[in-house]
């Protein structure tokens, strides 16, 4: 397919490709820890295409060499507007290390799966290099790594509580969540300032005449030009925050020149009894400082409770956290994307292929998703260990049927197309099109999960839109079979949907995630009961038998999750023995930034009750729990049984 090798069809990555387009200067340069794959499953490509569609000249520098003379950081020059940085589709530390902190030998987002093509703490490394090379340039960071480190967070790999990544990265603006709207607004704001030649923040003494076009360096970004943009974070000193309080009608914050003082609308939360539920009016919340959180694990747990509660609201508050002599300001998110907005992103001219520079090199992550279709964003499952709701949001944004069919029409023209779709899914495959029956009730809600501890009565559990998509896709003459490769929630299942899924959309194995069998652990995980899994298992076996199929149900399990003891792991092993399972899809818990489970791992406290939670922290403790998965290997099984008999240790 000749078009796949046309360099002008992709976002440029080299000086030569700029010349092919006749460009002398770029507006935005994106640095990514991943290889450049021009596909909507990869964030750098999406952000680049969105900016391109908005009329900006954009280039991507994938996996630059950070070790040598930094020529990869200078080869395209200085952009007119800003540098954009993402570590890639994964946090670079999760990408590099196992739960046991062993270095991984491969990287799915790199040609030939080669490890070592991005640094540890990738966002910080790239940003510091660019700050040194271009001290007066605007730097915007985003992606999952930056997003989940926007406030004080526990870093498992250094075993420390770190401040907002804005501190160590020296970046100016952090875009959290899915960043399409933010980057365009940032580009538009900086572009206006560049055109107007605004260089200094001019605020009249009476605070009436305000020049909003302030983006100068090197003293630091004068954030006035950008401060109203939703879903970003930035740092200011006390004086700048005071000005922001006067200008922000939504927050009503008023500060003295020395810092945050005397505001009746700033809410300070220090005890678990002060609820953030049932409020529809945005406000500003002042967290306890980073320094206080470092000194007290209880303070960090309290801060997290506030952060997670706000992230689950439709009308969230502005969050402010003191760090040293400055303040991190996190603006509330945009409203959930409409179907039309999401469709517009997927209609951009993606090539659905790696950049031609990689030639025929194998990129594992691309091979996995090249014939998959993401039908929606967001997840209302609220699992304790998961980052999806904090990154993509709890509300579901769904694409239209026509948008999905248009993407499949493009995929069929790829040379490798054989007629099979590997996945019609999303973060949780069976949440497509779901929302509250009465959105006014949703606006008053801050539940972390619409499914736990039981399914919300206000949730519209209508599977008709999803079943209709399956029907239309399977009717396409160039589609032989469409599968659901994403995980499904077995606690969100009608009989009609379950039968359609099992009979027509399983490629021999269906992935589900009970995660554990012990009820006390499942409660902490915010997962349904093991009995509910067993009911689904029986239903799955029944439907397979009726249809003459022999498909497997593959459960995912986690060891050493906060709250899990050796005895709980023995119970899991015993349950698997009874069901003749030999667990395959198993993992040891990895604490990742900004999740409830990670907060419990670090503090030993449940942030919502302040009760102590048992945590297996040491390498030996984690290995012991993991060994229970391998009960069918005799030597390990005997050792695991001995471990279970030992008294548990509290932290």
Residue positions per predicted region:
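N-terminal [4Fe-4S]-dependent radical SAM core
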Residues: 2-25, 35, 298, 302-372
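Flexible, glycine-rich loop/tail regions that form catalytic "lids" or insertion modules at the edges
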Residues: 28-32, 74, 229-232, 274-275, ...
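Conserved SAM/AdoMet-binding glycine-rich loop
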Residues: 30, 46, 66, 409-554, ...
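N-terminal pre-triad scaffold of radical SAM enzymes
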Residues: 31-36, 359-387, 420, 590
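Glycine-rich beta-alpha loop elements in corrinoid/cobalamin-binding modules
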Residues: 35, 43, 62-196, 206-248, ...
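Flexible glycine/acidic-rich beta-alpha junction loops that bind and position SAM and/or redox cofactors
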Residues: 91-100, 148-150, 180-185, 395, ...
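Conserved, mostly hydrophobic/aromatic
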Residues: 172, 345, 379, 383, ...
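Conserved alpha-helical substructure of the radical SAM core
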Residues: 392-417
């Amino acid at each position: 397919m000749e078009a796949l090798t046309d360099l002008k069809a992709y976002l440029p990555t080299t000086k030569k490709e700029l010349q092919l387009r006749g460009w002398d200067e770029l507006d935005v340069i994106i640095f990514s820890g991943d290889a450049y794959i021009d596909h909507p499953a990869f964030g750098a490509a999406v952000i680049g295409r969105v900016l391109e569609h908005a009329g900006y000249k954009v280039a991507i520098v994938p996996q630059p060499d950070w070790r040598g003379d930094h020529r990869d950081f200078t080869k395209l020059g200085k952009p007119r507007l800003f540098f954009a940085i993402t570590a890639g589709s994964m946090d670079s530390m999760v990408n590099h290390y196992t739960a046991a902190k062993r270095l991984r030998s491969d990287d799915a987002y790199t040609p030939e799966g080669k490890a070592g093509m991005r640094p540890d703490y990738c966002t910080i490394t790239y940003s510091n290099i660019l700050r040194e090379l271009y001290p007066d340039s605007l730097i915007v960071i985003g992606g999952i790594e930056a997003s989940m480190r926007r406030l004080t967070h526990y870093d498992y790999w250094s075993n420390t509580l770190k401040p907002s990544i804005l501190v160590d990265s020296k970046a100016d603006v952090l875009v959290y969540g899915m960043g399409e709207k933010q980057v365009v607004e940032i580009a538009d704001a900086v572009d206006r300032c560049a055109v107007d030649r605004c260089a200094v923040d001019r605020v009249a003494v009476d605070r009436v005449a305000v020049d909003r076009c302030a983006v100068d360096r090197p003293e630091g970004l004068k954030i006035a030009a950008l401060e109203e943009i939703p879903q970003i974070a930035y740092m200011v000193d006390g004086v700048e925050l005071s000005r922001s309080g006067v200008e922000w009608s939504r927050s009503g914050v008023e500060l003295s020149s020395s810092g945050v003082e005397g505001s009746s609308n700033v809410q300070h939360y220090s005890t678990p009894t002060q609820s953030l539920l049932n409020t529809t009016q945005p406000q500003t919340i002042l967290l306890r400082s980073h320094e206080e959180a470092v000194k007290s694990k209880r303070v960090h747990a309290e801060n997290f409770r506030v952060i997670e509660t706000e992230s689950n609201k439709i009308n969230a508050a502005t969050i402010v956290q003191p760090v040293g002599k400055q303040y991190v300001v996190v603006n509330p998110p945009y409203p959930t994307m409409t179907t039309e907005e999401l469709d517009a992103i997927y209609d951009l001219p993606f090539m659905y292929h790696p950049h031609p520079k990689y030639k025929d090199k194998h990129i594992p992550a691309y091979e996995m998703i090249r014939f998959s279709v993401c039908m929606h964003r967001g997840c209302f499952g609220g699992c304790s260990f998961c980052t999806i709701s904090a990154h993509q949001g709890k509300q579901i944004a769904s694409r239209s049927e026509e948008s999905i069919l248009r993407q499949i029409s493009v995929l069929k023209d790829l040379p490798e197309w054989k007629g099979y779709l590997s996945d019609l899914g999303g973060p949780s495959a069976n949440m497509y099109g779901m929302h509250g029956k009465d959105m006014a009730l949703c606006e008053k809600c801050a539940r972390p999960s619409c499914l736990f501890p039981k399914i919300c009565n206000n949730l519209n559990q209508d599977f008709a839109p999803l079943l209709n998509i399956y029907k239309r896709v399977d009717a396409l003459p160039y589609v032989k079979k469409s599968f659901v490769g994403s995980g499904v929630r077995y606690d969100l299942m009608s009989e009609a949907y379950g039968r359609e899924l099992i009979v027509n959309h399983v490629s021999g194995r269906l992935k589900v995630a009970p995660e554990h069998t012990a009820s006390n652990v499942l409660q902490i995980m915010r997962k349904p009961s093991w009995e509910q899994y067993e009911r689904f298992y029986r239903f799955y076996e029944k439907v397979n038998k009726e249809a003459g199929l022999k498909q497997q149900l593959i459960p995912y399990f986690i060891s050493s999750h906060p709250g899990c003891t050796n005895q709980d792991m023995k119970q899991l092993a015993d349950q698997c023995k009874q069901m003749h399972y030999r667990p395959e899809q198993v993992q040891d818990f990895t604490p990742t930034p900004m999740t409830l489970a990670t907060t419990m791992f670090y503090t030993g406290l449940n942030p919502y009750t302040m009760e102590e939670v048992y945590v297996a922290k040491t390498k030996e403790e984690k290995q012991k729990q993991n060994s229970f998965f391998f009960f069918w290997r005799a030597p390990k099984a005997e050792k695991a049984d001995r471990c279970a008999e030992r008294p548990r240790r509290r932290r």
